[in-house]
């Protein structure tokens, strides 16, 4: 299911990932790989949160990091900037599912907050 021969099609069923991705890490990677199994293509939506709370990375940096991490899936992903979405609401019979993907305990322990703290200690982030 890698991306080389695949051609993105907006009409095909598509899964959505919504998040801050500050920064993209192995937990996000595993989540992406599980979500990709659902439909074969994923729209990764990046909330516009640069400068809000502890969100040091701008959209272009986040997008670059995602594409670098997912280069083998490049034709199966779109990365889009969206407003700072905090609520997802829907009416009945909308034609899509909202699903929680539960990953293994080790993956769930990965913390972007701790990653940012380590990056600051190493001088890689202000």
Predicted regions and their residues:
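Nucleotidyltransferase catalytic core that binds NTPs
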Residues: 1-126
